């Protein structure tokens, strides 16, 4: 197997806002808390690639996660079918920069961002030779400062006898406006440059 593998994009959290009410589509586990986005999930497929389908009122979101073969690139495709009022989709990349076999326990991240519209260059913990890039066409990027998701809990790590909690960085979020009674596609690209 390849050596020197790293976790960079841990996950992407989404929420939808309709008529002033926010619905979180993500499900995260902390030691004494589980967020309940799973109640909006209608289906999950994994035959060729992960496909999640969510439904909130009259709005349906299909999320497809793809990776480019032989590259350090992830694409998350969102297909949105809105049969109701205007809405806003928020897409939040949650990142790390650690070896695949370690945990970022009690870690405080140092994030530097270079933002040009919806294109973002991240330098995590001063690894300037290994920048991470995000790009979401039609998304409005909002930078976060010193935003850390603390104590994400991994049940499988605990079952293996390892410490099950770690900190993750939340560098910012994308917001996408969705018109009433509309269909829309949007993509989040994340890629990594550099060699170990």
Where are these regions (language model features)?
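Terminal accessory carbohydrate-recognition/targeting modules of carbohydrate-active enzymes
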Residues: 1-196
